[in-house]
């Protein structure tokens, strides 16, 4: 399927960057095949960065070029490790996307792959362009948000998962930012995307299992047990919980504590938020968040559930407080995603722990986001791009302001 005789630039005009990851960048592309502007096809081009060959490794960071042999050895090891992981993730995503093209596409709820190119810069996946925005971005902008809308989201994700699972594909990293609307229309289909961490039967490298977003990771994945299609159903249960409450089911002051809560399936519906909901959606969440994966419903079974179908989901507008919390959660998620992507592109293994300790599990309010933006503009020497030390300084300043605010209110804050 990989085309080595054609150049990507000959087929597509490549324009703005749509997103970045630790090992990839996504740009918008416009087909050059048609002379008519109305017939031109817009696509998303995901470039998976080619890892360096062992005989031609990337340059070591400046601090490792000194005469400190321990420092040099450690940096060399981490560099080789990063190259190895990049190679695994690149190979894995191509394998999974090929399987999707063969057995799933076209599907209204799974992103479509049009073509693949390879050159000295890496492997380029030409994908269906989803211009309707991320799942939570769309929801927080809606004038009216109800259980019916949440059920429609779950239904579309379940439809996509059912098709993937029938082909023995497990997504492994299902989360809101990996669910995008195809366009800006009201009835736009919701597409599952980003299969870099997905698995195909027994053919996936074990390294892939080391990654994933902690909020959505299943107990069996945390315990390094067998990850199956039921692991995706756990993630969907977490998404549904957030859709109906505005916050995740597992909230803790540290990742270790959060992992323990996930392993024990320790969540509740005690807060006043849940008093306005009938039993059915809560029972559905409880079934999806069973610690025993065998007790969770499959995606196909979910599509027969009365609430998911929309028969028992209520049309009443949800409390404004839920939408407000969802906005805060979404803003915090974006900040952390940008921070982690920044770390992956620099000192991936050496600095992540320090950065996570700064970010914690804080729930950013609109005024805090505005303050944080202001601090970045003051602190960043080079304008838009922050160094890690500048980022650390801004986060510390945010935490200091929050502590002052908490002391003035003289009341505990939920982290």
Curated annotation (Swiss-Prot):
Protein name: Calcium/calmodulin-dependent serine/threonine-protein kinase
Catalytic activity reported: L-seryl-[protein] + ATP = O-phospho-L-seryl-[protein] + ADP + H(+); L-threonyl-[protein] + ATP = O-phospho-L-threonyl-[protein] + ADP + H(+)
Keyword line: ATP-binding, Calcium, Calmodulin-binding, Kinase, Nucleotide-binding, Serine/threonine-protein kinase, Transferase
First-tier enzyme category under EC: transferase
Gene3D superfamilies found in the cross-reference section: Phosphorylase Kinase, domain 1, Transferase(Phosphotransferase) domain 1
SMART domains: S_TKc (SM00220)
Family from the record: Belongs to the protein kinase superfamily. CAMK Ser/Thr protein kinase family. CaMK subfamily.
Catalytic residues (positions): 173
Organism: Malus domestica (Apple)
Function: May be involved in signal transduction processes.
Keyword DNA-binding annotated: no
Single GO molecular function: calmodulin binding
E.C. no: 2.7.11.17
Residues noted as binding ATP in the record, renumbered to the chain: 18-26, 46
All copies of domain Protein kinase, residue ranges: 12-308
Stretch list, region Calmodulin-binding: 318-328
């Amino acid at each position: 399927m990989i085309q080595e005789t054609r150049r990507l630039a000959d087929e597509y005009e490549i324009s703005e960057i749509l997103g970045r990851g630790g090992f990839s960048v996504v740009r918008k592309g416009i087909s050059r095949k048609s002379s008519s502007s109305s017939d031109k096809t817009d696509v998303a081009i995901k470039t998976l960065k080619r890892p360096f060959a062992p005989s031609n490794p990337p340059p070591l960071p400046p601090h490792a070029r000194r005469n400190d042999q321990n420092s040099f050895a450690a940096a060399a090891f981490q560099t080789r490790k990063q190259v190895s992981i990049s190679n695994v993730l690149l190979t894995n995503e191509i394998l999974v996307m090929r399987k999707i093209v063969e057995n799933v596409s076209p599907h209204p709820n799974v992103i479509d792959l049009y073509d693949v190119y390879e050159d000295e810069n890496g492997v380029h996946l030409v994908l269906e362009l989803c211009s309707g925005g991320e799942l939570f971005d769309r929801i927080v902008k809606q004038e009216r948000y109800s259980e019916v809308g949440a059920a429609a989201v779950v239904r579309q994700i379940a439809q996509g998962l059912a098709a993937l699972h029938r082909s023995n594909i497990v997504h492994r990293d299902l989360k809101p930012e990996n669910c995008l609307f195809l366009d800006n229309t009201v009835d736009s289909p919701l597409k599952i995307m980003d299969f870099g961490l997905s698995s195909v039967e027994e053919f996936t490298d074990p390294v892939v299992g080391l990654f994933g977003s902690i909020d959505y990771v299943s107990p069996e994945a945390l315990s390094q047990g067998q990850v199956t299609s039921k692991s995706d159903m756990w993630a969907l249960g977490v998404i549904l919980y957030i859709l109906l409450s505005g916050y995740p089911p597992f909230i803790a002051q540290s990742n270790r504590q959060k992992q323990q809560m996930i392993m024990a399936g320790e969540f509740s519906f005690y807060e006043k938020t849940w008093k306005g909901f009938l039993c059915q959606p809560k029972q559905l969440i409880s079934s999806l968040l069973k610690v025993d994966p065998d007790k969770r419903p499959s995606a196909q079974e979910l599509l027969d559930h009365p609430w998911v179908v929309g028969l028992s989901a209520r049309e009443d507008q949800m409390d404004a407080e839920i939408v407000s919390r969802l906005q805060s959660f979404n803003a915090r998620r974006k900040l952390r995603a940008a921070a982690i992507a920044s770390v992956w592109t620099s000192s991936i293994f050496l600095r992540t722990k320090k950065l996570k300790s700064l970010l914690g599990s804080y729930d950013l309010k609109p005024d805090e986001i505005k303050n944080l933006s202001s601090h970045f503009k003051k602190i960043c020497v080079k304008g838009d791009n922050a160094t890690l030390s500048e980022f650390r300084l801004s986060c510390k300043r945010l935490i200091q302001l929050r502590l002052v605010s908490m002391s003035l209110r003289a009341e505990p804050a939920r982290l």
